[in-house]
Amino acid sequence: MDKEQAIKIARAYKQAILPLYGDAKVYLYGSYSKGTAHQDSDIDVAVVVPHIEGNWFSVVPPLWTKARSVSTLIEPVLMEAGEHSPLYDDVMRTGVIV
């Protein structure tokens, strides 16, 4: 799979989560955004929302369920916009918004 195919899958995932997180920005990050993907790479997708509402353990599982309905390669992560973490910084620096 190439970067463009990974972007198409990430876009399909974005459409799948719109009912849950209509205000989310979705980024492809990791090996596909950096051009270092290989045959066994997963598709790293960051779902960035203005504010995480509710219990983490109740809001994250639906993201995984939707991911599996699109592709078993998707590895979603939920983030709050502006959070202070190395992963968030990496997504903002190297991620591709879809």
Where are these regions (language model features)?
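Short, well-ordered beta-strand segments
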Residues: 27, 44-46
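Glycine-rich beta-strand-to-loop/alpha-helix junction loops that act as flexible
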Residues: 29-31
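Catalytic core of pol beta-like nucleotidyltransferases
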Residues: 1-25, 34-39, 50-98
